[in-house]
Each structure stands twice: as structure tokens, then as C-alpha cells.
């Protein structure tokens, strides 16, 4: 480095507060971690000093231990009895709990898990308080968990540096010119322990501090202020790490616990990292880290430093090779953004001993779940609310769910949640024998941002110059459907609104002659701009009207409604081809599954249909009275119309590969078929936050297997259930909800970000033995699986509920690989034998796979024709 010059340029300084800050060479990031957070919350609540040994209790186990108790060799997951033997003066505080039938959580003494549910609200509330304090000092914060977060400090530090060194405010004309020499700063001890090179020749020129050290200095100062502020306001201590990226800052935040902070300088990165193991690095832990160690033959980062990038790519593949090389060299360009807003909430409880045996017992628990969801719902940031409430019931032989929509004008109170779920429970009771219940849950789904400027369908019904008026008794948020009359309706027809609620009927609409729904929509679409006239405008391609951007969505909805309304009106003009009304089978979209056709509709189709249903009502029938009075001229000339109807029917084709039935003359159908066809043959696109449990190879394909269960993140569970839903449609199977249910584990084979294989495993205890040799000796030619009660056996562990492979990847060993991984990974630390596996209602092809798989595990022995099945 040239004497008096920095190795950083003016461009590097300017880059600190622009998009892509994570790539700036002057980047600084902090990681803050609360010290024994749950224990601290209870100590503050009870007014105890931090020096008093304290552990947080849940039932008879410990879930958090403060540092004073750790000094007595007490650890988490010990029982209360064991812990008090080690430290008689140990103070234990049980977490807050809800009692069945109560709507308020309390600190109960010795609660029974059969009648109580844990409440973690106090810790969530304190976590929110801590984050709010941090955001006052630095706004870019990402919550990593309930007790830790990452802070992007680069732009905040740049602002301070420019204030401290005003000469940096006047940049050089050439941004590539080096910055002036950085000042020498004295680090006070309160800023934390600074990790530097162990052996430093301070006479060397390259030891001179540069601007990256200055940025670290002021970042450490901000973090110290944050930690002091948290303690001043809440009395909580926390530890912190400050360095150049999230991985390094998290790595050093635990170096100097509790209640201290650690700074890792750039010249010390190598010395610090080579002393660690690969699995110590963020994102390289768990099973993924173990796979890397096995492939590289070492667990030392020091050895990785001696490996080239090409060597790692050859060993680990194009994706994982560079990832491991960068992380082991201290490079992490992960962007820190605000946390992704949650889309769902779940409150659930397992009843392992005391089952729920009646509706009254279930409603008592609904009161608890409702209070839990209500309190968490109120904590949501912004104007957000769920669209759907869902009830899930699990019994010994049954898992069923029911859901209902939450009206936008309803207050989501505890009473509303209880009443809504009670209604759903009664629906399930009428259809199934749901008792005794072993798992019960209520969830909010489809949580969305509420647009304050949004309006309902009544917003389209503006007054016109034809004396259209509405009764003031109609609420702006009224539910129900509007039955509109078209231009062929009589003048004396009335306009009515209906609702399930007690709403007075509106007065009749006075209309001018010849005015129908299209006229009303047209008035809305081309209405004169008011206060938005000064806004930017765009020209509509459909009608060439200039529309303000603020009204664009409304205008596009108008065209959707108008086009579909015309189409529906035209369809109503086509008379039947026979005197007797013929029931025409509606066109369906999707793959043929049994006697039904199914595939998800496109977003555009769903939007059109939802809008039209809400707008038109009565099944989209625009002309109920007109159909009763069809003019003779139309009814008598039906030949051409009938021929047109037959032509449309003949254009329906069925794809030979994906079995989807669609209309070959409809652009919309062709697009739907294209999407569905690629999905069926190529697999479902999916990605997970967690690491895979198995990697087939580390080449370009990056084939791997993921395991998703109730302990996985909610996002991953949802993605796995979406893939399972697709598989259920493929196999014509009943839907199964796996989110939050302990007994299910989903194994997914992912290739190039597509799920091309899926296996759903569940815990079982018994199954029926099936002997194919006996069936063959009896000359049975049926594909059915026959079971006998006397063949029921216990001792089974793993049940295979679903197993599926995409058509394009069959006969490549994927199903066997999924099954083998299920044997190894379904129960942690235990490898299940083939004799402990049973299959749920296999088809003929499923039987052939089972027999083949058993034979391969028994070296081709004929005894392998014995297998087990169970009733799911």
C-alpha cells in the first residue's frame, strides 16, 4: 500500500449506501444475541438479580438456564429434580400456560399437560420490544430468531464517518482514486474484544489501519449504544459480534459471552477461521456439513484453505463448491433485509394421554387456541389480516380439515374464532367419527396486506345521470351478491342486495330506458377524474382511454367484468338442440383422475370468476327473466346455433401424455394445458430453506433429497404440502394435511429445483402380512391386495402412505432411493429394517415396486414376496 494512501477508493465509499451494499468492501454487519433470553425474561419478571441461579420450566423439563445456573453444571433438557440435586438453591419459573376453557394465560403452579397449553407470548412481546429499540439506532434489521438478529450498519456508519471527517464529503472527480490515509483510532475496552493477528510486526507498512478498521470502530460504537439502551430500558443483557458480513459477525458473537461484544478485523480473518471446524460455519452445519466432511475427508477449515476452487467444484459441484470455498474464506454476501411477513399462524396441541372425547371438550380448547391466535394476530405489523380460518382434527384413523372465509368487515375476536371453529367442527362431526381426538389445531391462512383504499363491489355502483339512487341503509361493507339486470330487462325490474346478516332491503333503483349493466360499467370506466387528475396517466389498450395510475386496477377489473359478461350473455343466446333441456357437462381443466378432471386454474381465470361471481350473482346469469321469454325468431332458427355448439364440443381433446382434457380452440385452455403438461412431466418447482439430508451427486444436476416434518420451518412445511397436494391429484388420493402433525415426514427428491419424486411416511404400530406366493398358488389374478384379520401383526414402525415419481424420471431408482432414505432418516439415530415397513393400499404397479424392492433387499430370495400393508 502506498504510504499515505488507502487501498479503498472513492467509489468504495460511495457504494456504502446504495443498492448492493452487501457487496461493498467497507461493509459492516452486527449480530446481537440475547443472553439466555427466556431465563432473563423470567428473572426480570420476578425481580431477581442475574446472579441468582434460575431455570425456565416447561412441565417437568428445563427449556432455558441462565449463566448463574450453568456455573452449577445445569443444562437444558434436564428434569427439575435432577437440576435441584446439583443446585438446591436453583429457582425455577414455569412458563405461562392456558387452561382449557379459559381465554387468558396465567402463571399456574404445577400445570398438568393434559389440561394446559404453554404460552410463549411473554417472550414474543419482549422480543418485539428489543427489536423496536434496535431499529431506533439502525433501521435495517433482520430477525433471525426470537432472541437474535442481524443488523446492516454500513450506511449508518458512513453517515457518522462523513460527519467526523468532513473532507470526505467532497469526492474526487475520478471515483477510482484512492481515499486519503485513514486516521489511527484508539479502541476503548468498552467497545469489546478486538480479534487481530496473533503475530503482528507493527513496523510493517501494511499494518497501518485503513478505512475498514474505521468503519468497524464506529459500528462497534453503535452496537455498544444499542446494548446499553436495551439494558437501560428492559434490563436485558446481550452479546454481539461485529465484522464484515453476517457469517463472521455471528461466528464471533458467541466468542465472548455473556454481556460482551467481539470485533473481528480483516487482517485476523484467516488466523481465526483456520482454528475452526467446517461445521462451526453458519450454513455449513448439520447433515449438509457432515456430507461435506465425508466428501473432502477433513473437518478442518485450515485444510480447505489449501484446496483450490477447481478442486472443490470437482468434489462438491458447481453450486456447493464455490459456496464452501467462500464461506471457509470468510466471504458471505448475503443481503440483510427486513423479515418476510408471515402468511399463516397455527395454534395446536397434541393429546397423547387425555384425548378429546366430546364437542364440549374441543370447544374448551378452542377458547385457548383463539386467545393464542388473537394475541399474535394483534402483533402483526401494518394493516394485515387473514382471509381463511382452518380447523384440523386428527384421530387414530382420521385426519380431516375444514376451512371457511373470514369476511373483511368482521372483527377477528376470540368469540368469532371460537364460533367459526365450532361451526367447522360440527360439519366434521356430521360426516365423520372424529372422536377421540389426538391432535387439534386452528390456523389463520392467507394473511394479506389490507389495502386501505380498496373498495367492494358497491364501489362500482356510482350514481348516473339517470336518477340511479340507493338506499342509505345499505352498508359500504355489505356482504352478499348484487343481482344486476342487463339492457334487455324491463324498466320496472328492481335492483336488490342480499346478505346473510340482518340488513334491510334497499329501495328500488330508478332507471332510464335501455340502461343495463354495460352502461353502468361504462360510466364507471370513463368517469371524469377528480382529485387524482394531477397523477400520472396511462392509455388503456382496450378502450384507448387515459386513466390515472391510481385507478388502473379498477379500470382493468372493469374490462375483465365487461368481457366475461358479454361472453356469458352470448352463451345464454344459444338455445338447446332438443326440446328437453340437456344437462351439459361443464368443461373441466386438468388431468383425468378417476372420474373427475382437475388442475388448478390460472390466476387470471380465478380472478375473473371470483369477480364475476361477486358482481353478477346467481351463477353469473345476466338474463334470468329474458330466458323465460325467448323471442320466437331466435328459438325457431336454431340450426346454425346448434351446429356452432357441436363444433365447440368436437374441439375438446385429451393429451396422451398428461391426460388433461382441454379445448384445442381456446387460447386459455391451451395455456392451461401447457402449464399443466410441463408440471406433470417435469415435476413441481419448489425450494426449501433447510439443507438436504442426502445428495445423489455433486455434479451439475445437484439431485438431492429433503426431509420435511413438523419441526421444519412453517415455510418449508407449506412448500412440502403444496407438492403433496399435486401428488395426491396425480394419484387420485385423498388430500392429507401434514403441517404441524408429528407423525408425518415428507421426503422429496429435488432435481434442478423441481420435485420429481415424493414419499410420505407416517408412524404406524401394526400392519397386515401379505403373502404373494400364497395368492399365486391360489391362482389369484386380481390386482387387489387381500388382507386377513389373522395376519395382523405388531412391531411395525414406518408406514409409506404415498410414493410418487414424475413420468419423466421413472425407472431411474428414485423411488428406491426415497424409501432407503426414509428407513435411515425417519427416526433419528435408528435405521429401520425392511421388516418394519408397511405400505398403504398399493396399486398393481405399487405392488410390483414393493416386491422388487423387497427382493433387492433380500438378494432376490423368493421369501421377499411377503410384505405388509396397513389401513391409513
UniProtKB/Swiss-Prot annotation:
The keyword DNA repair applies. In the C-terminal section; belongs to the acetyltransferase family. ECO subfamily. In the N-terminal section; belongs to the DNA polymerase type-Y family. This is N-acetyltransferase eso1. GO terms for molecular function: damaged DNA binding; DNA-directed DNA polymerase activity; protein-lysine-acetyltransferase activity; zinc ion binding. Probable acetyltransferase required for the establishment of sister chromatid cohesion and couple the processes of cohesion and DNA replication to ensure that only sister chromatids become paired together. In contrast to the structural cohesins, the deposition and establishment factors are required only during S phase. The relevance of acetyltransferase function remains unclear. Keywords: Acyltransferase, Cell cycle, DNA damage, DNA repair, Metal-binding, Nucleus, Transferase, Zinc, Zinc-finger. A zinc finger (UBZ3-type) spans 533-567. Residues 592-872 are annotated as: Acetyltransferase. Zn(2+) binds at residues 540, 543, 555, 559. Its main location: nucleus. It comes from Schizosaccharomyces pombe (strain 972 / ATCC 24843). It comes from the Eukaryota. The lineage of its organism: Eukaryota, Fungi, Dikarya, Ascomycota, Taphrinomycotina. Signal peptide: none annotated. Interacts with pds5. Its EC number is 2.3.1.-. A zinc finger (CCHH-type) spans 653-677. GO terms for biological process: error-free translesion synthesis; error-prone translesion synthesis; meiotic sister chromatid cohesion; mitotic sister chromatid cohesion; response to radiation; translesion synthesis.
